Amino acid sequence: MGALGYVMQVPEEEKYLNTQKELEAMLVGYLGGRAAEEIVFDTVTTGAANDIEQATKVARAMITQYGMSQKFGLMGLASQENQYLSGRAVLNCGDDTATEIDHEVMQLLHYSYEEAKRLLNEHREALDKIAGYLISRETITGKEFMKIFRAVEKGLELSLIHISEPTRH
């Protein structure tokens, strides 16, 4: 099944390392589409499947590889197998610890999902305006998104501001 829409996250600068806060923000971003579905339509669809998969990979790496777990601290719980082929992470722990890791990953994803819902509810008017713009134009750039967001947050009429970027030929 194909995607009806997607978000492409383009880094502002080339980076090789991410902070814990940046990874936590990525999780919230990945889960934002599912959270918006629940808020706006009071239901969820299969549309967020890839986002959930990506969020789970990031959360699991935070816990097992990056030492970003309160419970496990700096303990390396996974290593890369065939780094240059599949790059798959393999757990270096017993079944009980693997179960605890799953629990930590679920908690991190749950917190991130709740944070996404909180932010979307807090900025619901901007969400609706941006969705309306996206429906009429089919695509939106980061700059256009931020213009609409800032205008709504400042209480400005959208009809009074120029939103779309000039077309390049």
Set out the residue ranges of the language-model regions.
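Soluble catalytic regions of large protease machineries
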Residues: 1-160, 164
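Short "domain-exit" segments at the C-terminal end of structured domains
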Residues: 165-169
